[in-house]
Amino acid sequence: ALGPVSALGATHPLTLNVPDIWRDTPNQYGPLFLGVQKAVYALTGDHVIAGTALHRVVAVLGILMLGWSVPRLAERCGVSDVAALWLGVANPLVLFHLVSGIHSEALMMGLLGVGLVFVFRALDDMGPETPRPPARVLALFVAGAVLVTCSALVKIPTVVALGFVGMA
């Protein structure tokens, strides 16, 4: 993984906008988020404002996925879905930090949340109370596992969740 100076050069306009402390730091993002960054750059070029705006759109998509998944996960765990939504998604700290700071964690957590919802639905569909066709159960489980894997491809810490999916 390369840092801004080694990847772009010390005089590149984007490198000049990186604080000195981070200029030689290697990139810690996974291949999926690097692909997102590459697509943003392909669309916006050296236009910092447009690139920042597009990265924020990606962060908002992650927050929207999180907003869809958190109440469902909370309900499954016997926690108030409204409280979970306010504390986990809609509070100013989450919105300010993840969207304003254009952090990859918004996309990472959104993919993780939706993936876990799909995996849990597959497990619920296997139960005797609500038997579903095996193809549906398998499709939900595989889709969930793929989304959790994509989350880990944004940033590696969520690979731990894939272990729990495998144990499910």
Enumerate the language-model features and the residues they cover.
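Intramembrane catalytic core of multi-pass membrane enzymes that act on lipidic substrates
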Residues: 1-57
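Membrane-water interface at transmembrane helix exits
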Residues: 37, 41, 45, 71-75, ...
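Membrane-interface starts of transmembrane alpha-helices
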Residues: 46-58, 80, 84, 136, ...
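Transmembrane-helix motifs of polytopic, lipid-linked glycan transferases
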Residues: 53-77, 109-110, 114
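Multi-pass, polyprenyl lipid-linked donor-dependent membrane glycosyltransferases
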Residues: 57-61, 85-119, 123
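Transmembrane-helix signature of polytopic, membrane-embedded enzymes
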Residues: 70-92, 123-130
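Membrane-interface transmembrane helices that cradle and orient dolichyl/undecaprenyl
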Residues: 78, 105, 112-140
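Membrane-interface alpha helices of multi-pass inner-membrane proteins
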Residues: 95-97, 118, 134-166
